Swiss-Prot record:
PANTHER family: THIAZOLE SYNTHASE. The lineage of its organism: Bacteria, Bacillati, Cyanobacteriota, Cyanophyceae, Nostocales. The keyword Oxidoreductase applies. FAD binds at residues 5-19, 44-46, 173, 325-331. This is Bifunctional protein ThiO/ThiG. Catalyzes the FAD-dependent oxidative deamination of glycine. Is essential for thiamine biosynthesis since the oxidation of glycine catalyzed by ThiO generates the glycine imine intermediate (dehydroglycine) required for the biosynthesis of the thiazole ring of thiamine pyrophosphate. Keywords: Cytoplasm, FAD, Flavoprotein, Multifunctional enzyme, Oxidoreductase, Schiff base, Thiamine biosynthesis, Transferase. It comes from the Bacteria. Disulfide bonds: none annotated. It comes from Trichormus variabilis (strain ATCC 29413 / PCC 7937) (Anabaena variabilis). Its main location: cytoplasm. It is found in: Cytoplasm. Gene3D superfamilies: Aldolase class I, D-Amino Acid Oxidase, subunit A, domain 2, FAD/NAD(P)-binding domain. Pathway: Cofactor biosynthesis; thiamine diphosphate biosynthesis.
Length: 652
């Protein structure tokens, strides 16, 4: 039997996705190796994006959005099952000791998006009696909350079961069967299971199935209980201290956590781990030393190098990733479920997903070994090794492309030359000027029918627009044009706002204004900009799918004149950087890719060449060579010479 969707992993993330997909009418199967071992059972259930002082803007936004979903989401689950999730909007108190007063100040300065309040020593001790004597103040985060993580896991399982999700516990997935960029089945300890689409939500075990940089981070915890002799709950809000948190439950239990240990899958609690927790907790809230201990336990959180999750598309078109949530799996469950379901069912890719794509780790690689084994040589000749698997795709707004070269349709001497060049370039994205096609401008007659749009992704552009308002109108026309050509789900737009007729430099203010509106309307916006790092960051923050800084003025063929600024943009961007405009030769294309650009858009240099098709092929090869050189990592530049052969031990 072939299912619609198979979810690999039965923790909170996998189950949340399963419930959301089932509510949207799909047939869902969950494969779970060991439900009690899921990281959810080893968490504390804090919903604490403010107390955690998250500095990454995209992660902060993701966490805030997820926290805002919690009241309605848990209510829906409770209605489905009749069970209680233990959701409690109790707020979080973060006491500090002498010298820690600046802790939390970043949240306070956050433009009022999520409030935080400083409490002086007298106030905090009055607000929460029983704090340690050396607590000198603290921050109050009223919008943070908690949920009973173990109850939530049980409720999600019950909700999935009641909705008709096929739940399979005790199933070990041993491998993914892959053919031609697709997963065609999963090999399990009970046989092969097939589906149309697959979701990887295996948490700390993700690396067993794919070469993803997800590692286990062990966390030890314990639970104490408020004695019955204490008539009322002494704690009614979470205490968030330095490397310690204390989470009271309404059933009179109190969770104390958690260590963070990079020890692989080493099991069990340790005396050192428990001692560390008890010392930190008793210093923060001394009366805990008299409470009876109920239990100890441990679990494994899925950590990535940047401690951010991996969400969205993978190297296989029908495999979606949802892993690496580290400390925030419980918090991010509702937003992860919503975004993944939107992507799979509605083919909608939230711009925020691009920040958490797996390919970000390839950008960080400075070297990739090229020849590491004698198998790379045959009859004395070097064989070309394959490119790194995880670098095989360019991801824009959740859509995968193998080619990193985009081309255009303007300036060709004939439709035939344009068709030949598009094929020779190997490109998968072709940009089209909406206004010129609509008005059948010279050179654009019959353009819509000239290319095979079942193989090429159209990138409508707003060329010719001088104001933000004009660009927004043309973008809407472009979306409809793509639909007429069979690309119903195409929400891409190359945003150009260019009032300057001589140098054709984009208007930064108009571009930002148009981008903000188009993102709100659900467009994947690819803005053409001056090589301005500050503008690039602003456009990323408003949700653009890429930024497209110019190398030099459009059609000038001057090459890379903005290298320093493009490097800054690349170093700071968490969305793809596409160098656009001004590249005139393959050497310049290669240079741009060697800087670390994710892709190039080249039109004039191809269309105006004496042999456009040959130039298109040359640009394709240069793009690939530049990307490979970037991944390989160039040798360091030295002031003085360094001989390749030994300068000692010569024959005299």
């Amino acid at each position: 039997m072939t299912r619609d969707i198979v979810i690999i992993g039965g923790g909170v993330i996998g189950l949340a996705i399963a419930v959301e997909l089932k509510l949207r009418g799909t047939k869902v199967t969950v494969l779970c190796r060991d439900f009690p071992a899921a990281a959810a059972h080893a968490a504390a259930g804090m919903l604490a994006p403010d107390a955690e002082e998250i500095t990454d803007e995209a992660m902060k936004s993701l966490c805030w959005r997820s926290r805002s979903l919690y009241p309605e989401w848990t209510s829906k689950l409770e209605d489905l099952t009749g069970l209680n999730t233990g959701y409690w909007p109790c707020g979080i108190l973060a006491p500090v000791y002498e010298g820690q007063e600046s802790k939390g100040v970043r949240i306070q300065e956050n433009k009022g998006e999520s409030p935080a309040y400083w409490l002086e020593k007298a106030v905090i001790h009055q607000y929460q009696p029983g704090l340690g004597e050396d607590v000198v103040g603290g921050w109050w985060y009223p919008e943070d909350a908690q949920v009973n993580n173990q109850a939530l896991a049980r409720v999600l399982w019950a909700a999935a079961e009641s909705l008709g999700v096929e739940l399979n516990d005790g199933i070990t997935v041993e491998g993914l069967l892959q053919q031609q960029g697709q997963v065609v089945g999963v090999q399990t300890n009970t046989g092969i299971i097939q589906a149309e689409h697959y979701v990887l939500a295996t948490g700390a075990w993700a690396n067993e199935l794919l070469p993803l940089p997800v590692t286990p981070r062990k966390g030890q915890m314990l639970r104490v209980r408020v004695p019955e002799s204490v008539p009322e709950l002494p704690l009614k809000r979470v205490l968030f201290g330095e490397n310690i948190y204390i989470v009271p439950r309404r059933d009179r239990s109190i969770i104390i956590g958690a260590t963070s240990e990079d020890v692989g899958f080493t099991p069990h609690n340790t005396p050192a781990g428990i001692q560390t927790l008890l010392q930190g907790a008793i210093r923060l809230y001394p009366q805990l030393q008299d409470y009876p201990i109920q239990e100890f336990w441990w679990g494994f959180r899925p950590a990535t190098p940047d401690e951010l999750p991996i969400l969205g598309t993978s190297h296989c078109a029908n495999l979606t990733l949802a892993t690496g949530h580290y400390r925030n799996g419980i918090l991010l469950a509702p937003i992860t479920a919503a975004l993944i379901a939107d992507f799979i069912v509605e083919q909608k890719s939230d711009p925020l997903l691009s920040h958490f794509h797996y390919s970000r780790f390839q950008k960080q690689a400075s070297t990739t070994p090229m020849f590491t084994h004698s198998a790379n040589f045959s009859n004395g000749h070097a064989k070309n090794p394959p490119l790194p698997t995880l670098d095989s795709s360019l991801i824009i707004a959740g859509k995968s492309f193998h080619s990193r070269l985009m081309t255009g349709t303007g300036k060709y001497r004939s439709i035939e030359e344009m068709q030949q060049s598009v094929v020779a370039s190997g490109c998968e994205i072709v940009t089209v000027a909406v206004r010129r096609v609509q008005t059948k401008a010279p050179g654009h007659e019959g353009l819509a029918e000239a290319l095979d749009w079942s193989r090429i992704w159209m990138l409508p552009n707003t060329a010719g627009c001088q104001t933000a308002e004009e660009a927004i109108r043309v973008a809407r026309l472009g979306r409809e044009m793509a639909k007429l050509l069979g690309q119903e789900d195409n929400n891409f737009v190359k945003l150009e706002v260019i009032p300057d007729p001589k140098y054709l430099l984009p208007d930064p203010i108009g571009t930002l204004q148009a981008a903000e509106q188009l993102v709100k309307e659900g467009f994947a916006v690819l803005p053409y900009i001056n090589a301005d790092p500050m503008l690039a960051k602003r456009l990323e923050d408003v949700g653009c799918a890429t930024v497209m800084p110019l190398a030099s003025p459009i059609g000038s063929g001057q090459g890379l004149k903005t290298t320093a600024n493009i490097q800054i943009i690349i170093e700071n961007a968490k969305i793809p950087v596409v160098v656009d405009a001004g590249i005139g030769a393959p050497s310049e294309a290669s240079q741009a890719m060697e800087l670390g650009a994710d892709a190039l858009l080249i039109n004039s240099a191809i269309a105006l060449a004496q042999n456009p098709a040959a130039m298109a092929q040359a640009m394709n090869l240069a793009t690939v060579a530049g990307r490979l050189a970037y991944l390989a990592g160039r040798m360091p530049i030295k002031t003085y010479a360094s001989a390749s052969s030994p300068v000692t031990g010569t024959i005299s």
